[in-house]
Amino acid sequence: MMILWYNPFRRMIKVKLLKIKAFHYKNCEDGVELSFLPLFRKSEEDKTYELYEVAPDLYTFLTMSIVGKNASGKTSVLNLLNDVYRILGSFQLKDEVISINGTKLEITFYENEKIYLYKTELHKQFDLGNNLSFVNESIKVMNYSKTKKNVIFKEENYKPLNMKKELPDDISILFYILKNRNNYAYYFDDLVSEEGIYHKVYDLYNKGSINKKYWKYILQLFDEHIKDLKEIKNDVYVLTTVDQTQELSAKELFHVLSSGTTKGIALYTSAIQALKEGNTFIVDEIENHFHKTLVENLIVLFKDKSVNKKGATLVFSTHYCELLDIFNRNDNIWITKYDKKIILSNMYRDYNVRNDLLKSKKFYEDNFGTAVSYELLMNLKRTLMDE
């Protein structure tokens, strides 16, 4: 009798980002890089709660955090990640207020038993409006196997993928290999535009993976008085609470519900969408407007594989270092500093910190140079006292 060997990884065609590297990106130092791969030994507990097996013995993080002082570059790092996902998902990229004209990108990703190394330069062209052109593009490929897990980032192991570009200048050649894939990331900052937030959130609920049961629990998680919220036509809503039913415009609804409730509904709705699709969810300053327990529970949802069945990734920035104590590892924690340029370092790789110690304690001891300056606080206090 013939026995067919079943490879469970063959069905996983979702693109998984492994590393990004950038030059001339905004105010970041040249060669700034963000890796999604673990840097030290993986315990069985880590494989259960911290890591997702993309392919045999190839693991990526389920959660990652960017921490640092105010104005240290956390948002710029998240913007870089979001820009990369825009290229992977829509094969186009628009220039930004702080121009990224001249940026060079190196993107390493896994897709369908292969690892790709994509390089490009982004340039502004007059005839493309706000769209950037992709210049000097190249793609190299390596067939993945367990024996190659330690040479993923060594370019000499890749072979050039030759293709003739017959696309407009503002369309990446990644289109040829990823055109049938859903490679988007949800960036929470893109959702929160005051009253416009409700339409975007309800669109996720109505057209996405958020069924009636989830919707009810999400609403009541942030305001237990809400029984239901429906969009009956564009930007007109029916809000049902324990006391009454009201028909409200988006602007009126924005003032009836608290800011925390509005942002919380948006946060959890988009997080669940990412979980259901196995996509990446990016959140800047995750603790804003939310109770610490709600934020901790969101992080735990991404770490729990009974919920996170498709390997979705949560990447967030925070000032609240106690959140990092939820992490069992420290190689998924990245630290930003600003010294003429934005510098991104890894807690495990660049600092001598034992993994079994509380991360928050090390932050409060200012081991990473991220604490608020006591001297500056005292200068402000003395100035106020002298008035």
Predicted features by range, described:
Residues 2-86, 245-376:
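Switch/communication elements of ASCE P-loop NTPase nucleotide-binding domains
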